[in-house]
Design a protein with these regions (language model features):
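Conserved GNAT acetyl-CoA-binding A-motif
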Residues: 71-73, 100-113
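Conserved beta-strand in the GNAT
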Residues: 11-20
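Conserved acyl-donor/pantetheine-binding loop and adjacent beta-alpha core of acyl/acetyltransferases
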Residues: 22-76, 139-141
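Conserved acetyl-CoA-binding loop-helix of GNAT-fold acetyltransferases
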Residues: 76-79, 85-102, 121-125
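Ligand-binding pocket scaffold of soluble enzyme catalytic domains
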Residues: 17-18, 73, 88
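C-terminal "cap" of GNAT-fold acetyltransferases
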Residues: 71, 113-117, 126, 136-157
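A short helix-loop-beta-strand connector motif used in the catalytic cores of GNAT acetyltransferases and
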Residues: 1-5, 21-26
Length: 157
């Protein structure tokens, strides 16, 4: 639902992957995981153990969530570091939010960490607010410290 790609001179500089509701997102994730897991175990993505540890950590340390009835849509956004600060993220988010409104979606949520200052500034500027936060050891093995996971929401009604 409402997936978008930003290009500059034929090169992808950003994208948004979104779901209008939780159930289709969960089904798509499960389908993809069923495809990827055997390949992961066979080493097609490199040594399997680090990937398995990551997946287990996702299950062990879930981030906070917002109510699905008020904020059924989810999004993941990424912008190439070289393109950040040039309006790419803002344009992607504006188009994504417009698409959700046109589909009658009442609200959207996303997850980030407190350490992601640039993204948090963008979300705030685009009308999102922090709904919930929780300290999480999820990132500790990768960054050497736990981080604060946050779920941000935006009403669209």
């Amino acid at each position: 639902c409402c997936n978008l790609v930003a290009e500059e001179e034929g090169r992808v500089v950003g994208y948004i992957l979104g779901a209008c509701a939780d159930r289709p997102l969960a089904l798509a994730f499960a389908k993809r995981l069923l495809w990827a897991l055997p390949r992961l175990l066979l080493g097609r993505f490199g040594p399997p153990l680090p990937h398995l540890r990551y997946l287990l950590r996702l299950l062990r340390y879930p981030g906070p969530k917002a109510p699905k009835d008020r904020y059924p849509a989810h999004l993941h956004i990424a912008v190439d570091p070289e393109a950040q600060g040039h309006g790419v993220g803002k344009a992607l988010l504006a188009a994504f939010l417009k698409c959700l409104r046109e589909k009658g979606v009442p609200g959207v949520q996303l997850a980030t960490t407190r350490a992601n200052r640039a993204a948090r500034g963008l979300y705030r500027a685009m009308g999102f607010r922090v709904y919930a936060k929780r300290a999480s050891p999820f990132w500790a093995p990768y960054l050497g410290r736990p981080l604060i996971h946050e779920v941000w929401v935006r009403d669209l009604g």
